[in-house]
Curated annotation (Swiss-Prot):
It comes from Escherichia coli (strain K12). InterPro entries: ArsR-like_HTH (IPR011991), Carb_Metab_HTH_regulators (IPR050313), DeoR-like_C (IPR014036), DeoR_HTH (IPR001034), NagB/RpiA_transferase-like (IPR037171), Tscrpt_reg_HTH_DeoR_CS (IPR018356), WH-like_DNA-bd_sf (IPR036388), WH_DNA-bd_sf (IPR036390). Pfam families: DeoRC, HTH_DeoR. Inactivated in the presence of the effectors sulfoquinovose and sulfoquinovosyl glycerol, leading to the de-repression of the target genes. Disulfide bonds: none annotated. This is HTH-type transcriptional repressor CsqR. It comes from the Bacteria.
Length: 261
C-alpha cells in the first residue's frame, strides 16, 4: 500500500503512522524523525487535528479517538493475509527445540501465533503481548525480563531488560524494524527499544528479519545494525534494487512467501 493512502501527503501519513504506533509523540521527537522544523510539525499537527485525524496536546499530539484508528485498522486488515503468510514462513524456518528471542511489534505477534504448533521452544521476549500469545502452550518455556513497561505496545525496556537478555544465547532472533535504508542500515524509532534489540542481535546465532514492503520507504532515527548481520529476510515484496544487491552480496536469504502458500 502506498504511503500517501491516508491523506495524499507522504509526510502527513508518516506522522500519522508514528502516532498510531506510539500513541503520543512530542513535537521535538516528530521534528527529528521527520527531518523538518518544529514549526512545520506544529502546522502539520494543527491541520491533521482539524481533520479529526489526531488529537492536539500541549507540546505534542496523540491518537484521535476514532477516525485515525479506524483508518489504520483498515490498513492492518488489508495486510493481514500478507503478514500471516510471512509469519508462517518464519515458523516453518524454526525447528522444534529452539531457543528464540522475539522483540516487540504487531508483525512478530503474527509469528508468535504461527509458532503455537511447535514443540519444546524456549522463548525470551520483551513483549508482554507475545508472551501472552505463547504461554498457553504447555510445551513452551516463556521468559520475560524485568524493566519499564510501555503502555502503548506492552514492550519492556531499560537496562535490566537488556541485561537479562544478555544472559542467553538464542538459536534465532525474530524481529521487525522501523525502516531498512538503501545502504542496508536497520533503523528503529525508539532508542530504549533499540538497546534491547541490539543486545538480542549480539546474542543470537541466526537473525530472522520480518519486514513488509513499507519498511523499504519508511524513515526512523536509531540505527540498530545492518542487513549484513541478518540470516534471512522474510518479506512480501522484493526490496528495491540497491538494497537487494546488498543482500545478495552478503548472501542473505530473501524469503518471499505466497499468500496462498
Amino acid at each position: 500500500m502506498s504511503l500517501t493512502e491516508l491523506t495524499g501527503n507522504p509526510r502527513h501519513d508518516q506522522l500519522l503512522m508514528l502516532i498510531a504506533e506510539r500513541g503520543y509523540m512530542n513535537i521535538d521527537e516528530l521534528a527529528n524523525l521527520l527531518d523538518v522544523s518544529t514549526q512545520t510539525v506544529r502546522r502539520d499537527i494543527r491541520k491533521l487535528s482539524e481533520q479529526g485525524l489526531i488529537t492536539r496536546h500541549h507540546g505534542g499530539a496523540g491518537r484521535a479517538s476514532s477516525v485515525v484508528n479506524t483508518a489504520f485498522e483498515q490498513r492492518e486488515v488489508s495486510q493481514t493475509e500478507e503478514k500471516k503468510a510471512i509469519a508462517e514462513a518464519v515458523a516453518d524456518y524454526i525447528p522444534d527445540g529452539s531457543t528464540i528471542f522475539i522483540t516487540i511489534g504487531t508483525t512478530v505477534e503474527h509469528v508468535a501465533r504461527a509458532l503455537l504448533n511447535h514443540n519444546h521452544l524456549r522463548i525470551i521476549t520483551n513483549s508482554l503481548r507475545v508472551a501472552h500469545i505463547l504461554y498457553h502452550n504447555p510445551r513452551f518455556e516463556v521468559m520475560v525480563p524485568g524493566g519499564t513497561l510501555r503502555s502503548h505496545n506492552s514492550g519492556i525496556i531499560g537496562p535490566s531488560a537488556a541485561s537479562f537478555v544478555a544472559d542467553f544465547r538464542a538459536d534465532y532472533l525474530v524481529t521487525s524494524v522501523g525502516a531498512i535504508e538503501s545502504d542496508g542500515a536497520l533503523m528503529e524509532f525508539d532508542v530504549n527499544e533499540a538497546n534491547v534489540v541490539k543486545t538480542m542481535m549480539a546474542h543470537a546465532r541466526n537473525i530472522l528479519l520480518v519486514a513488509d514492503h513499507t519498511k523499504y520507504h519508511a524513515s526512523a532515527a536509531v540505527e540498530i545494525g545492518n542487513v549484513a548481520q541478518v540470516t534471512a529476510l522474510f518479506t512480501d515484496e522484493l526490496p528495491p534494487a540497491a538494497l537487494k544487491s546488498r543482500l545478495q552480496d552478503s548472501q542473505i536469504e530473501i524469503i518471499l512467501p505466497q499468500e496462498d502458500a
